Amino acid sequence: MLPLSLINQGDNVIIVKVRSKVSEKKHLEDMGFIASESIRVISNHGGDVLVELKGTKLAITTEIAAKIFVNIIYDDINQSDKRIVNK
């Protein structure tokens, strides 16, 4: 499990949990950042983290992204399946 702020551009992840104050967590949940949702990281180059969530592109600060914990989804081309990896 890693914070979203450390995930590379192009990676697909599954949200595991959000560690934040209640009001901030509620706001993130309202945006769609809930456990078991998948996210694709579009950009993560210092400033904001740009993600695609449910077909919508969203930008969040690195500080907020550090509070969203995820597992990376790896595609295994040889076996035509996806694997979630806990780190």
Residue locations for each model-derived region?
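C-terminal structural segments of small proteins and small subunits
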Residues: L50-K87
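A structural micro-motif recognizing beta-strand termini
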Residues: K17-K21, K54
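Ubiquitin-like/PB1-type beta-grasp interaction modules and other compact soluble beta-rich domains
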Residues: L2-L6
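Short alpha-helix capping/helix-loop boundary micro-motifs
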Residues: S23-H27, N44
